[in-house]
Amino acid sequence: MKLLLAEDQSMLRDALSQLLQLQPDVEVVYQAEDGREAMELLKTNLVDVAILDVEMPYQTGLDVLEWIKEHQPVVKVIIVTTFKRPGYFERAVKADVDAYVLKERSIADLMKTIHTVLAGQKEYSPELMEVMMTHKNPLSHQE
């Protein structure tokens, strides 16, 4: 399979890319250091799965997700983040993200997530679901 990895922290991006390339079913891992570079790579390279960080320079992972779903809807998208912010998660789900998971996971778990989304299923970290279920969004006085 062909993957795109968009992560602005170079050490993390390089390490994750190397670990993914060791997997027997991974053919290539394209690397992008920001959202703009990710979109440029997607315009010239066919990928099966895009693995995106949320907060990146120029274009966020959420911006890239929305671009992919509009221009290359066959590409599966996994958001990998440290942020448990409900607003990010809600925007990603609204944009039809295939998986939204936390960075505190092993390569084996990430590979399971990749295979899950390639099989047409969704995956969301339980910790994120818990935040969503307990997130209070009170109405303003005007509402």
Locations of regions flagged by a protein language model:
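Two-component signal transduction core modules
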Residues: 50, 77, 100-101
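The feature encodes the CheY-like receiver
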Residues: 57
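Acidic catalytic/metal-coordinating carboxylates
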Residues: 34, 60-63
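Active-site residues of response regulator receiver
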Residues: 53, 81
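Short, flexible helix-to-coil linker/hinge segments that flank and couple to helix-turn-helix
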Residues: 87-93, 98, 102-143
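Acidic, metal-coordinating helix/loop segments flanking the phosphotransfer/catalytic sites
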Residues: 31-49
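Short amphipathic alpha-helix used as the core "switch/output" element in two-component signaling
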Residues: 62-73, 94
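Conserved acidic carboxylate
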Residues: 7
